[in-house]
Amino acid sequence: MYLKKIFNNKKIVVTGHTGFKVSWLTAWLKLLGANVMGISLNPPTHPSHFLVSKINIGIKDIRLDIRDRKKLEKKFIAFKPNFVFHLAAQPLVGLSYKDPITTWQTNVFGTLNVLESLRKLKNACNVVIITSDKCYFNKEIIFGYKERSEERRVGKECRSRW
């Protein structure tokens, strides 16, 4: 299997690994033989796919808010990942209206914290940053503007630093 050759025995950070979709990604990477470190808040639902499927077994399961740049940097530097899949976010549209500051801090500045943590690494690292379909300037839903902001910021960071 081609993907097994890529990910087997590689160190991979997955942010947001306790969420439903990302827990599936984490399980898949484990099956491919990756050494996974998941960084996330507690599972968002009870029961959760993450806990029921016991995805936490056999990975480094870290509870950490991506808004905490210093702690995030320490984890990245100590782990020395070969790959990072960044999917941690505050994904709920309703909550983004109730608490826009936390949503922006998590989704935009959290992504910047991941990028800064990558920049501190001494080793080469591949990164995949996944946001949502809302980043395509959905003018009916204001929520999408923060995703688009995140997409633009990532592009600027990549062009200016790498």
Indicate where each model-derived feature is located.
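N-terminal Rossmann-like NAD(P)+-binding domain of SDR-like oxidoreductases, especially those catalyzing
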Residues: 1-156
